[in-house]
Amino acid sequence: MTKITYRTILVIGDNHADIARKYSADLEGNENAYYKWERCQQHRLEVTGEEGDFSDPFPLKNGEKSYSARFNDIDWEKIHRNPKQMELSKRAWELVVEDSEPLNEQERYLKARMLQRKSYFTDNFVTKEVYMQYYSSLWYYGVATEEKYEEVDTWNSSILEWCINFFDKFLKGLEETNPLITIYETHSLD
């Protein structure tokens, strides 16, 4: 498996720039470095209207987009376990693994493109429900807070568990404190 070079991470906290720098190799002699070249694309979005190269902004409840927003302003239902994504992943599994008949042109196209990749589904996901959770889950490669930095280990099978449990582990319950959540693009050290 190839190690991923560019990563998106979440930084949780009002002083997001300081937190992001805290774990960056761009600080000379930083022994707590996990990445380098950390950038938030918010300024680019505001000035040019362009989104980042490796990350998508949060959809906000007011209809706008942002790379940095208060937890309660983000429309989490659009990006985590979205019913449309859940249904699409369910149908993909049924078409490819269960060999269901396509109901429309989009499904015929999907089945034709994915049928030779049936092993992707069966080798990586124990059940349809696990695939649906994985496909529709919001996740990032790392999370930085004032207290610590955690990231997924892309070299082992824990990536599936990381993706499925990301929201519950790092974001669930933050509505009470309503912290600033910021997306950063980073470059791995290796």
Please state what every model-predicted region is:
Residues M1-K169, G173-E176, D190:
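Acidic (Asp/Glu-rich) sequence patches and key acidic residues
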Residues N178-D190:
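C-terminal or internal capping secondary-structure element at the end of a domain, subdomain, or sheet
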